[in-house]
Amino acid sequence: MSIEINNLSLGYQDKLVVKNLSLKFPKNKVIALIGPNGCCKSTTLKAVARLLKPKQGSITHKGKDIWQKSPKEYAQELAFLPQQHLVPEGIKVQELIAYGRSPYLNLWGKLSQKDEELVTWAMAQTQTAELAEQLVSDLSGGQQQRVFLAMTLAQDAELVLLDEPTTYLDLNRQAELMGMMRQMQQNGKTVITVLHDLNQACRYCDHLIVMKKGAVMAQGTPDEVMTEELLKDVFDLDVIIHRDPISNTPMFILK
């Protein structure tokens, strides 16, 4: 297993929103956390990214509690693209993407040849090379999203967390992003993402984790998980399930 959550409770101030959650994320898969708004998908992802400390329980990676790892060690293992970004003023696109290499820099902070190659590769993957000298703050929302994705790719971590990564992206860019997730998996990485589009989740993801009110309702492959009964129970949706003619995965049409 890539990441294991054991008896985890999470909360903000004195309010618990996740109680006694236990969950295993399979290695080398594209995994989607899905569920209605407020079901704690992003909260769970933040805990795995070490942005939210558990009230109780543990999260382990490679058998070691993630809070026992140094920030640099964990940043070499895990890259996280949050749902919302703080866009720094006065920084150019290529500079921001190069920040993805920060966990690997020496005391002098100089990029190695490998670092520079990974930055160039990440820009090519996200089609941001033509934006390299522009200020990030001057870009559109969709362009900024691609730049932050490039920074995440440049980090070259084996575990990649993407919180609602299709935000601000048009349909063409969304399809490209989904293709990149598949490519990362084929290159040996584990991708965990929060998605709202159920048809996208079924077409592009190997493993689905369905959440409701901070609890896991079901998990498995799209064919194992996505039933008309579950969609009614979790999302209050009345649907007809067909087969996607492209991927042969479940596809949903509202009644």
Question: Where in this protein do the model-derived segments appear?
Answer:
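Helix-to-loop junction immediately C-terminal to a conserved catalytic motif
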Residues: 49
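Catalytic Walker B motif of ABC-type/P-loop ATPase nucleotide-binding domains
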Residues: 160-164
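The feature captures the beta-strand-to-loop junction immediately N-terminal to the Walker
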Residues: 34-36
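Conserved ABC ATPase signature
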Residues: 110, 135-139
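Conserved ABC transporter NBD signature motif
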Residues: 57-65, 73-74
